[in-house]
């Protein structure tokens, strides 16, 4: 029996149909996977359709089906002829890019070069191949950014190609082609790092060009709302007006020094001359502005009723400070020389967070009674609050000269004239006076709390808050029920970044005097500093509500505007901004209705 052309299964009783059936039932999944195309196996079978056979092929088929075993079970010549025809009709396209030429030279694909199978593919693969064959420069210029951004979890510098597969050609070859490529082309290695570096360099150049183009474009004009323009203009005008005012004050001070230097009486004490010189550095706050008659019900009291006494009773009973202020105003309007009424009016207005009105009243009190120690101490603290340090130091020196004349006279004998206008020198000199006064009563039982108060103010001006706190605590050991001292201690603690302790001091002051508006204002500021914005707003609204007097209606033309507190409203705006409540911020304005906030805040 001959094995030549006999096939793998030869026997005496061999049946060609059975052999053919067995042959066609063999597992050819690898071959089908390698082809994976529709050009050769259009209908998933190995034969052409009858309509596609020529006459010779049909005769061979009939002869094969009708006759017994032939000398050769299979005739592959016609099929080989067809494959050669397909190869001739599908020539490889000319590649126009150097990168792809190098790619084909270094890593030739056996399927592409030796068989026509790789040239026949699905429409998707054919479209991809067409895009691949376009010039690389054109491709990157058009869509390089989009292509690289769409690569998930891949970085150009850290990518290593697997099994020799190009990142750009992952859809062309299947697993069998990759295995053949690895087996037959191990000697050809592609320098992928250089290829990707070139691509990355090209991409970076494109990005730089786009960045330059964007940078060169003109930025769009920013349109600012008219409301913010008006606000900016208002702030700018206020700054300019403040600068003009400061220049005017400095000019007045220079004129005062030139004209008043030789005009002081010869018998005037040196401390009085210094006070006149340094106190003039402050702004002139003008005369006190009284409320309109229609807004002050105490003006209508019968003559036998004393508005001054009523004001004292209101303060003692915990009434609103604004009501007590109206009573003292009525007493002054009855008698403009009422020294105590001016003093109490100044103290009430400073505690009511109306500093300017309080300063005007205290200055009037000192004009009537220059040696009033209570007015001097309160006025010095108000000057510190407003930033007139030299005027405050001169006022404190006047307080020492009034209450402890022996200390001031001894200092004047050692240094008769003071020509240095430096605030630090003035502070040092006045501090030495207060220290000398404190040494007169070293025993804590006989300690003068006002001396400790003055020392605390001097240390406060130098921002030595630790010493300030010690002085105020020493004063509180003598006067533990003084709400004003507790408030000043709280302010010192707050300025030394001890806001929690400051809150406790403010609460103590409010416990002693619930209508103490300045303590409520300071408490609101401390709440803002520790992030309690809603509580801060409630304290500030409570302070503003205490400025209102029952039965008194205010309007924009009322002189009440002269004695309103801007610090309360401005700090309330800060609290609303911190709460991100722009809707409430727009409601904060002079003569606003406080009751509109009661729905959200408790005060």
From Swiss-Prot:
Motif extent (WxxxF/Y motif 1): 99-103
One of the GO BP terms on file: protein import into peroxisome matrix, docking
Keyword Transport among UniProt keywords: yes
Residue segments, region Amphipathic helix 1 (AH1): 11-33
Pfam families: TPR_1
Keyword set includes Lipoprotein: no
UniProt keywords, alphabetically: Cytoplasm, Isopeptide bond, Peroxisome, Protein transport, Repeat, Thioester bond, TPR repeat, Translocation, Transport, Ubl conjugation
InterPro entries, A to Z: PEX5/PEX5L, TPR-like_helical_dom_sf, TPR_rpt
Covalent cross-link Glycyl lysine isopeptide (Lys-Gly) (interchain with G-Cter in ubiquitin), where: 22
Site of covalent link Glycyl cysteine thioester (Cys-Gly) (interchain with G-Cter in ubiquitin): 10
Main subcellular location: cytoplasm
Post-translational modification: Monoubiquitinated at Cys-10 by PEX2 during PEX5 passage through the retrotranslocation channel: monoubiquitination acts as a signal for PEX5 extraction and is required for proper export from peroxisomes and recycling. When PEX5 recycling is compromised, polyubiquitinated at Lys-22 by PEX10 during its passage through the retrotranslocation channel, leading to its degradation.
Motif WxxxF/Y motif 4: where in chain: 271-275
Motif (WxxxF/Y motif 3) on chain: 192-196
Region (Amphipathic helix 4 (AH4)): 232-248
An example Gene Ontology CC term for this record: cytosol
Region annotation Amphipathic helix 2 (AH2): where it falls in the sequence: 58-76
Residue window of motif WxxxF/Y motif 2: 128-132
Swiss-Prot/TrEMBL domain comment: The TPR repeats mediate interaction with proteins containing a C-terminal PTS1-type tripeptide peroxisomal targeting signal (SKL-type).
Family: Belongs to the peroxisomal targeting signal receptor family.
Role: Receptor that mediates peroxisomal import of proteins containing a C-terminal PTS1-type tripeptide peroxisomal targeting signal (SKL-type). Binds to cargo proteins containing a PTS1 peroxisomal targeting signal in the cytosol, and translocates them into the peroxisome matrix by passing through the PEX13-PEX14 docking complex along with cargo proteins. PEX5 receptor is then retrotranslocated into the cytosol, leading to release of bound cargo in the peroxisome matrix, and reset for a subsequent peroxisome import cycle.
Name used for this protein in its record: Peroxisomal targeting signal receptor
Organism per entry: Debaryomyces hansenii (strain ATCC 36239 / CBS 767 / BCRC 21394 / JCM 1990 / NBRC 0083 / IGC 2968)
